[in-house]
Amino acid sequence: MPEAGPEAEPGSPRKKIFVKTYGCQMNVYDSARMVDVMAPSGYTEVDAPEDADIVILNTCHIREKAAEKVYSELGRLRELKKEKSGRGEELLIGVAGCVAQAEGEEMRRRAPVVDLVLGPQTYHRLPEYVARLANGGPGIVETEFPVDDKFASLPMAEKRKTLARGATAFLTIQEGCDKFCTFCVVPYTRGSEFSRPVARILDEARSLVDAGVREITLLGQNVNAWHGEDQAGRPATLGYLIRALAEIEGLARLRYTTSHPRDMDEELIAAHRDVPALMPYLHLPVQSGSDRILAAMNRRHDADSYHRIIGRIRAAKPDIALSSDFIVGFPGETEADFEATLDLIRTVGFAQAYSFKYSPRPGTPAATEEDQVPEEVKSERLQRLQALLGEQQLAFNAGCAGRTMPVLFDRRGRGESQLVGRSPYLQSVHIDDAPEHLFGSLVDVVIEEGHRNSLRGRLREEAAVLA
């Protein structure tokens, strides 16, 4: 077992930690757990690096130039560290996450201001590392893959912290990926697939619900590859886990992301039909509509199999809102390949989507392909693709006008007395003149307008709090 960091002495001054998060929802979860794991050592979270004794950059390596953005931020932190040193104050600087995993020792060589480099599977040892550095120890680089050890060592979040984070929460149930898509760094930065045991997931979910969370999003790089054992010791998949979580009293909503088409099994599809708490929304990345490009990406499915999966899902849950990821300009992509992607979008119809220009990631097979698509072609294709997706998203949102939906209010809006919540379909819903007591509640809302990126509505007369 790793050495634990020191417990804070009663009455000792609270130290402060600032974590800046880049990238995906899993990093949001990881950042929150870093704060949790430092709490027993006397650290409290602050909103600005200037106020902190420790600054952690929790990084993402998916997009191009991710590392350079981190080094740029480290340049600013170097100046802050100098300022603090001039006032007799110390500042420890750490880099965590996937850029840290990929860069390793190179990060401390290029940026000596960094005291600590730790990969995504080692942040549970943060108190130990900080204690060693505080005692004058040398800089630390730790990029091992002890995934099970990490989750077994994480404390439950304090109730007050969970309350402060709101009525929605992320819960990581799976990490890593074994698919090895040729464009993706995840298998190299997050490691092979690992699934958390059912009991630990249920314990964490109950803790969140006890603290006021009403909606939990299950996270994984390949979340529907999660597997475990049911109460009888038989193999279980995500559909079983969702049913078990839905039995937790007080948990109103469940979601999960991100999925792979290869792992959409019948039990999971049936859960969409049978479990009321599972929201009618599915993010199922396809990346391309061209079979040739899908094969080059090593996606292990073709366009037709994706269509068949969508057909089974819609048969089980006719009102489901579909979301996806698309990459344009993958090496070798022709105009015909791109048109096949547009055809798939027109045929399926998406309520929401995320789209990107292909960016070579060092160490991935696609990065060394010779037939890279010119940048101007990528940009032009992305513009066309996003225009089509935007039309579909607007049509879906506009079609919600006149409907009454249960909305979970989890944010305060920009305007006075404005609240923002989530519909079952993950749309942002804005209402004005909202009573403050509805924050964190699930309430029926009449949708009046549907815009491209949000809905606007009003409370139903005599609307009661649903949860």
Curated annotation (Swiss-Prot):
Disulfide bond annotation, renumbered to this chain: none
What InterPro entries does this protein map onto? Elp3/MiaA/NifB-like_rSAM, Methylthiotransferase, Methylthiotransferase_CS, Methylthiotransferase_N, Methylthiotransferase_N_sf, MiaB_methiolase, rSAM, rSAM_horseshoe
Read off the SUPFAM superfamilies from this record.
Answer: Radical SAM enzymes (SSF102114)
Cellular localization per UniProt? Cytoplasm
Q: Does the keyword Iron-sulfur apply?
A: yes
At which positions is [4Fe-4S] cluster 1 bound?
24, 60, 98
Q: Which GO terms describe its cellular component?
A: cytosol
CDD domains attached to this UniProt entry: Radical_SAM
Listed under catalytic activity are:
N(6)-dimethylallyladenosine(37) in tRNA + (sulfur carrier)-SH + AH2 + 2 S-adenosyl-L-methionine = 2-methylsulfanyl-N(6)-dimethylallyladenosine(37) in tRNA + (sulfur carrier)-H + 5'-deoxyadenosine + L-methionine + A + S-adenosyl-L-homocysteine + 2 H(+)
Q: Record's Pfam families?
A: Radical_SAM, TRAM, UPF0004
- Domain named Radical SAM core is located at 163-395
Q: Which Gene3D superfamilies match?
A: Methylthiotransferase, N-terminal domain, tm_1862 like domain
Q: Which cofactor does it need?
A: [4Fe-4S] cluster
Q: What is this protein called?
A: tRNA-2-methylthio-N(6)-dimethylallyladenosine synthase
**Could you read off the lineage of the organism from its UniProt record?**
Bacteria, Pseudomonadati, Pseudomonadota, Alphaproteobacteria, Hyphomicrobiales
